[in-house]
Each structure stands twice: as C-alpha cells, then as structure tokens.
C-alpha cells in the first residue's frame, strides 16, 4: 500500500526531474524506518542512468522538498534508478518478475525470520507470495521493507 503523501511527492518531483532531462519513474515512502526513507526512482530517457544523474536529482530536489514542507518530520532522501536498483516496488514489477528469485526483507521478524529468499509467485493487497523449495510462503505486506531481485532465475 502506498503512503498517502506519495501522489503529492510525485506531482512535486516530476517537473524537477524533467528540468534535468530525467524521468521520475517511481516514489516510495518507507515510514517503517527510523528516520523514514523517501526513495525516488529516476531514469535518463536517452542513455543509461548514472550516479551523476542521481546526484543531480538529489541536489535539485532536496532543499526544494524541505522548503515545500510536504514531509513535516525528518526523513532520508534516496535517489536511485531502476538500472541501479533491483528493488521491486509496483504491480508492473511484480508481474514482470514472476518466477524470478527474490529476497524479501521484513521490518520485524515474521515466523522467526527477517529475510526470506524464494521464487516470486505474486503479490496482492495483503501479502507477497514466494515459493521456497516447493512450499509457498506468504509474507504480510505491512511487514515488508524491501523485495529485491536476486541474480539468476
């Protein structure tokens, strides 16, 4: 489930990215972290997105976002790229990478574990489902910090 501030953040960040010749392709606000983490995913439409693109976006938006006071409490800003990050965030990612190996990291232990590895089966409103050696595991979305694509299929 997306944080209620994400649409406002996207509306604010999109023109800034565009002014730098970049595209904003996603935003996630992880409020279960302390301090919360705002991650903006960008891409360069005409070449590979590099660290310099992420740095330019970070420099351009950081102070403006603070001045706009969209997020009233302290937070960390992360700028990344789908080419740099292997994290699955949106429905499109979870559909595209069905059957791929993923690592799921939870904010607190679930069934005694904070780290789950398996093949991605699906995601719905309540959970992410992975296959672990023929057994399906259901991990509540409310506990998930990250779902990261792993090497190999």
Swiss-Prot record:
For this protein, the record's InterPro entries field holds: Ribosome_maturation_RimP (IPR003728), RimP_C (IPR028998), RimP_C_sf (IPR036847), RimP_N (IPR028989), RimP_N_sf (IPR035956)
- Domain of life of the organism in this record? Bacteria
Localisation: Cytoplasm
| Disulfide bridge map | none
Give the record's GO biological process terms. ribosomal small subunit assembly; translation
Q: Does the keyword Lipid metabolism apply?
A: no
Instruction: List cellular component terms (GO).
Output: cytosol
Keyword presence, Cytoplasm: yes
Alphabetically ordered keywords of this record: Cytoplasm, Ribosome biogenesis
> What family is it from?
Belongs to the RimP family.
- What is the protein's known function? Required for maturation of 30S ribosomal subunits.
**Protein name listed in UniProt:** Ribosome maturation factor RimP
Origin species, per record, is Trichodesmium erythraeum (strain IMS101)
